[in-house]
Structure formats: structure tokens, C-alpha cells
């Protein structure tokens, strides 16, 4: 849900390895162009060090506190986002925008040095889903998260996936 919320707000998701050192986190933040961080409470110390190194203000850190986890003193819970009001999510329904709009920046394992960023578009994720999960071919082409339905016959963006 977090990834979809980030995309819906017009952002680009990136995730890190919880065992990263502050230096590795700093590299990840710079390479991914991260502006905000949502972190588990257990790894706040290396996150703070990387944020200081990369110039991300502490006000841009939210703690992902679920179940019985607590937010460290002086920090904000990710749940503060719920009090920010509501806005419609970013939408587009054309193939070109889907192919050119970044959805995530994922990283290689870094076998020859530090991990390298790879930008995946919305179209990349749709293609991956089609390859993995859509064994039976649909009678229509899917090219975005919003697509006309075969039953509508109007070519309008009337059904969300």
C-alpha cells in the first residue's frame, strides 16, 4: 500500500536494505534523489546519519510504526500523513506518459562496487505483471493502470486495475 500511496501522490518509490550502513544509505539517498524517508524505528540511527550527510531535514523523516512499535522521541509517525487532508491521486491514461513516468528506483546488489539505481516506469510494472501473472491473454491491450473495458466499447478510461 505504501508504494501505491507514494505513486498516487506523484512520487517515486525506492527501498533500501535494513542492514545498510550510513555510507550505503547516503549513496542510496543521493542516487535515488530521495526527498522524504519513511523508516522502521529499529534503523533510525543509520538513517539519521545518512540524512545528515545528504542534507535531508529531519522534518522529512517519518517513522513507520505499526503494531506495538513506538515512535522515538522528537520524530513523527507516518500516520501524520492522514491529517494532511485528501487530494485526488495523480492520474494518466496514455501509453506515452505510462512509459515515461518513473514509479520506482530499485537498486542492483552492488557486486562490483556500490549498488546502481534502475528506474522502472509504470509501464515496466504493468509489463512485469503481464509476464508473470497473466497466463491467459486478455482480449484487449492493457497499457496503463486505467484502461477502457472491452464491454464499454467507447475507448474511455472507465475501469481501474
Name each model feature, range by range.
Residues 3-9, 30-31, 152, 161:
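Short hydrophobic alpha-helices that are characteristic scaffold elements of the AMP-binding
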Amino acid at each position: 500500500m505504501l508504494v501505491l500511496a507514494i505513486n498516487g501522490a506523484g512520487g517515486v518509490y525506492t527501498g533500501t536494505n535494513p542492514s545498510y550502513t550510513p555510507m550505503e544509505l547516503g549513496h542510496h539517498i543521493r542516487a535515488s534523489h530521495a526527498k522524504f524517508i519513511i523508516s522502521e524505528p529499529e534503523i533510525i540511527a543509520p538513517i539519521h546519519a545518512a540524512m545528515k550527510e545528504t542534507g535531508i531535514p529531519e522534518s522529512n523523516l517519518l517513522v513507520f510504526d505499526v503494531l506495538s512499535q513506538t515512535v522515538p522521541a522528537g520524530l513523527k509517525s507516518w500516520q501524520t500523513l492522514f491529517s494532511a487532508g485528501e487530494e485526488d491521486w495523480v492520474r494518466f491514461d496514455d501509453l506515452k506518459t505510462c512509459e515515461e513516468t518513473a514509479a520506482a528506483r530499485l537498486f542492483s546488489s552492488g557486486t562490483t562496487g556500490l549498488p546502481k539505481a534502475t528506474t522502472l516506469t509504470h509501464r515496466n510494472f504493468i509489463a512485469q505483471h503481464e509476464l508473470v501473472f497473466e497466463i491467459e491473454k486478455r482480449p484487449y491491450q492493457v497499457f496503463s493502470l486505467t484502461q477502457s473495458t472491452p464491454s464499454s466499447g467507447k475507448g474511455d478510461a472507465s475501469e481501474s486495475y
